A protein has these predicted regions:
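Beta-strand C-termini and the immediately following turn/loop, strongest in propeller blades
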Residues: 26-28, 34-41, 51, 77-94, ...
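A short loop-to-beta-strand structural motif that recurs across blades of beta-propeller domains
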Residues: 46-48, 98-100, 149-151
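Multi-bladed beta-propeller domains
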Residues: 1-21, 50-76, 102-127, 139-140, ...
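Low-complexity, flexible helical/coil segments
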Residues: 71, 97-98, 137, 148-149
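Short catalytic/ligand-binding loop motif for oxyanion handling, primarily in non-cytosolic enzymes
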Residues: 16-17, 42-44, 98
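Short, hydrophobic/aromatic alpha-helical segments in well-folded domains
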Residues: 20, 33-34
């Protein structure tokens, strides 16, 4: 994706209500900043990582969709796991919103984390040591698909 002053984040906002930057994630040592940029029509989402010392930006992953890229319903559901050289990506590529694990170096899919006729609403917490993800989802349980439940995988 070439530089373009009209590019936006996937949320259309640069900062949240509390002033925090959206669609960004710092490494623990603040040496790297992961961020998502999007085309204005939101048909393209692009994960990139900037080196905070040099300013160099590495292209990590790009998803193109026919309609509108959505990174989650209540939050941006992507994470870079700098310690394990992986990243979690949210996609509706199977017509449902699910999360996928990719290798950060090779950019190859390692694992489909969630599947089924339901959707992940929000990644709540990732325990890197136990390799567990806590997330909310809708439509997984019988009954009202709008009821949201907390899960661990």
């Amino acid at each position: 994706m070439k530089n373009d002053f009209q590019r936006s984040t996937t949320t259309d906002h640069i900062a949240g209500r509390g002033g925090e930057f959206l669609d960004t994630q710092w490494s623990k040592d603040s040496s790297k900043l992961a961020f998502i940029s999007s085309s204005r029509d939101h048909k393209e989402a692009h994960l990139q990582i900037a080196d905070s010392k040099t300013g160099n930006v590495q292209s990590v992953f790009k998803e193109n969709v026919d309609t509108y890229y959505e990174s989650g319903l209540r939050a941006e559901n992507w994470r870079v796991l700098f310690d394990s050289d992986e990243f979690i990506w949210y996609s509706e590529k199977d017509d449902w919103g699910h999360i996928y694990l990719y290798d950060l170096s090779t950019k190859k899919l390692k694992n489909t984390i969630t599947t089924g006729n339901w959707l992940v609403r929000e990644i709540m917490h990732i325990d890197n040591d136990k390799r567990e993800i806590f997330f909310t989802a809708g439509g997984k349980e019988k009954g009202n698909p709008y009821h949201v439940y907390l899960y661990k995988i």
